Amino acid sequence: MEIDLEKFKRIHFIGIGGISMSGLAHILLEEGHTITGSDIKNSHLIERLEKEGAKINIPHMAESVIGADLVVYTAAIHDDNVEYQKAKELGIPIIDRATLLGLIMKKYKFGVAVAGSHGKTTTTSLISVILDRAGYDPTVLVGGEIDAIGGNVRVGKSEYFVTEACEYTDSFLKFYPYIAVILNVDSDHLDYFKNIDNIKQSFRQFASLVPSDGFVVACKDDANTMHVIKGLEKNIVTYGINEKSDWQAKDITYDEKGCASFNVYYRGKFIGHFKLSIPGKHNIYNALASLAVTYLLGVDTEKAKEYIKEFKGTHRRFEVKGVVEGVTVVDDYAHHPAEIHATLEAAKNYPHKRIIAIFQPHTYSRTKALLSDFAESFDAADKIIITDIYAAREKDTGIVSSKDLVDLIFKRGKDVLYIKDFDSIVEYLKENTEEGDLVLTIGAGNIYEVGEKFLEENKK
C-alpha cells in the first residue's frame, strides 16, 4: 500500500525504546505528529521522548494502540505481541521500522545510507558530524549515541538525510539512497540469510537503489564488496589502503594510543595529512568512506580533515569508561568475529599490561554459525571471560551455549573462563586485575554494565 505519513496524526510505536525506533519517533514528533509507544522496560531514550511529549506505556498493553492511525513495529516484535494483534483486529495500518525509515528518507533530496557488516555507526556518525560542522544542517539517524549531535538523532531543516542501513531482513532495500555506502560485506545474520552469496545479492540490490545521478561509495580492499558492485551500472567511488582506489590512505603511522595518522590521495593527487582521534586501523577505512561521501556533497576537504581529527567517537565504540586503581575500562559494541578482532587490534596499540576481554555473545544463531571464527577472534587477548549468550530477539533452543565457545578458545591455548553472572565477573575483576590492565567489555547486549559496576564499586 502507498503510505502518505502526513495523513496519520497519531503514530504508535511497538518497541519504542530501541535505538532506531526512538530516533524515528523523535523525528516524527518534530514534524508535528502525536507519538505514543510501548516497550518492556524504561530507558533514558524513552525518558527523553516523554519529555518531548510522547506518551509511553511499560509494558506492552493491547489498549495502547486504540485510537492510533498508524502502528510501527520493530524486528524484535513477534506476531503474538498483544499490541500487534490488537492493531490487526482493529484494522489499523501496520508497518515495520525499515518501511517507516524509508518513507522519511524519501522526503529528502540527498539521502546517505551507510551499509556494511561492520563500521556503520562510526561512519554514519563521522559523515553526520562533518556535514553538521560544515553547515549542512542534516537530519541524522544513528545506531549509537554521539555527544557531538546530542544523542542518536538530529533533526535538521535541509535536504540532507544520513542514516545507517542494516541488511538484516533486507531492511535497507526499503530505503531511498542518493549515496549508498558499502563498507564491507561479511557473513552475519545467518538466521535470516542462507549464506554469503545470499548476503552479497542483498547488498547488490541495495546498491541498485541509487538513482542515475547518485553514487555508490565502496571499499576497494574488501573482496566481497568488489564482487557486489562488479558490472553495476552506477557512479562508483572507491576507497582503500592496499588497493589503488579513488581515495587512498598511505604512509600510515600510529600514536601511543593506537590512533592513526596518514596521507590521503584522491585519484593520485595528494589531498592532505589526516589524523584520527579514535584508535584502530578499521577507523582509517571509516574516515576514508566519510571523506568520499562528504566530498561528493561538496564539503571542502580541508574542513573535513579538521572535523575528522576532532571526532572523538560514539558511545559503545572503543569507549573509555574510566580508570580505577590503574585499571582502564573500555567498552565496545563488537559482536561479530571481524569486529572483535579489529577491537582487540586497537586495544593492542593502547597502553596496557594485559588485555582482559569480557565477551557476551549476541544471539544463538550468530554464535552457532560463527563459533570457530569467534574462538579465533580472541587471540590478541591475554585473558578472556565469556558470559551467557544475550538472546535479543531469539529463544534458547539448546543449539549452542557459551561453554561451547569457551571449549574452543581453551583448545587454542588461551586463558579463558566461563562466568555466568555479571556480579561474579565484577568480583573476579576486583580480585584479579593489576595496575596497567586494560579491561575490555565486548558485545551488543548489556555487558557494559560489568565495566560500569567494576568502576563504581572500586571507587568506594
UniProtKB/Swiss-Prot annotation:
GO terms for biological process: cell division; cell wall organization; peptidoglycan biosynthetic process; regulation of cell shape. GO terms for cellular component: cytoplasm. ATP binds at G116, S117, H118, G119, K120, T121, T122. Keywords: ATP-binding, Cell cycle, Cell division, Cell shape, Cell wall biogenesis/degradation, Cytoplasm, Ligase, Nucleotide-binding, Peptidoglycan synthesis. GO terms for molecular function: ATP binding; UDP-N-acetylmuramate-L-alanine ligase activity. It catalyses: UDP-N-acetyl-alpha-D-muramate + L-alanine + ATP = UDP-N-acetyl-alpha-D-muramoyl-L-alanine + ADP + phosphate + H(+). It is an enzyme of class 6 (ligase). It is found in: Cytoplasm. Pathway: Cell wall biogenesis; peptidoglycan biosynthesis. Its EC number is 6.3.2.8. InterPro entries: Mur-like_cat_sf (IPR036565), Mur_ligase_C (IPR004101), Mur_ligase_C_dom_sf (IPR036615), Mur_ligase_cen (IPR013221), Mur_ligase_N (IPR000713), MurCDEF_pg_biosynth (IPR050061), UDP-N-AcMur_Ala_ligase_MurC (IPR005758). Cell wall formation. Belongs to the MurCDEF family. This is UDP-N-acetylmuramate--L-alanine ligase. The lineage of its organism: Bacteria, Bacillati, Bacillota, Clostridia, Thermoanaerobacterales.
